[in-house]
Amino acid sequence: MARVTVQEAADKIGNRFDLILTAARRARQLQLHVREPLVPEENDKPTVIALREIEKGLINGQIMDQLENNDAIQQEVAEQEAISFLADVQANA
């Protein structure tokens, strides 16, 4: 099990409060298997993995925003494609 110091992770983010928000968002992604870990799991829980990623500078608030924006765009494109497909099927029926 890797040792994580919250102070080092907070230094990467800027303050404890933003650290908590960023780590929670990332841990939720890991827990729901939305994204793969960027560091070896080593039997750690998602919160510890998130803190390790932050500590190594692999994740921060801006990166999380970009990832979530990309996911939202992909979701919107998929929905539009599904609507278009259903409209074509209905028109040809």
Swiss-Prot record:
<dbReference type="GO" id="GO:0003899">
    <property type="term" value="F:DNA-directed RNA polymerase activity"/>
</dbReference>
<dbReference type="InterPro" id="IPR003716">
    <property type="entry name" value="DNA-dir_RNA_pol_omega"/>
</dbReference>
<keyword id="KW-0240">DNA-directed RNA polymerase</keyword>
<keyword id="KW-0804">Transcription</keyword>
<dbReference type="GO" id="GO:0006351">
    <property type="term" value="P:DNA-templated transcription"/>
</dbReference>
<keyword id="KW-0808">Transferase</keyword>
<comment type="function">
    <text>Promotes RNA polymerase assembly. Latches the N- and C-terminal regions of the beta' subunit thereby facilitating its interaction with the beta and alpha subunits.</text>
</comment>
<dbReference type="InterPro" id="IPR006110">
    <property type="entry name" value="Pol_omega/Rpo6/RPB6"/>
</dbReference>
<dbReference type="GO" id="GO:0003677">
    <property type="term" value="F:DNA binding"/>
</dbReference>
<dbReference type="InterPro" id="IPR036161">
    <property type="entry name" value="RPB6/omega-like_sf"/>
</dbReference>
<protein>
    <recommendedName>
        <fullName>DNA-directed RNA polymerase subunit omega</fullName>
        <ecNumber>2.7.7.6</ecNumber>
    </recommendedName>
</protein>
<comment type="subunit">
    <text>The RNAP catalytic core consists of 2 alpha, 1 beta, 1 beta' and 1 omega subunit. When a sigma factor is associated with the core the holoenzyme is formed, which can initiate transcription.</text>
</comment>
<keyword id="KW-0548">Nucleotidyltransferase</keyword>
<dbReference type="Pfam" id="PF01192">
    <property type="entry name" value="RNA_pol_Rpb6"/>
</dbReference>
<dbReference type="GO" id="GO:0000428">
    <property type="term" value="C:DNA-directed RNA polymerase complex"/>
</dbReference>
<comment type="similarity">
    <text>Belongs to the RNA polymerase subunit omega family.</text>
</comment>
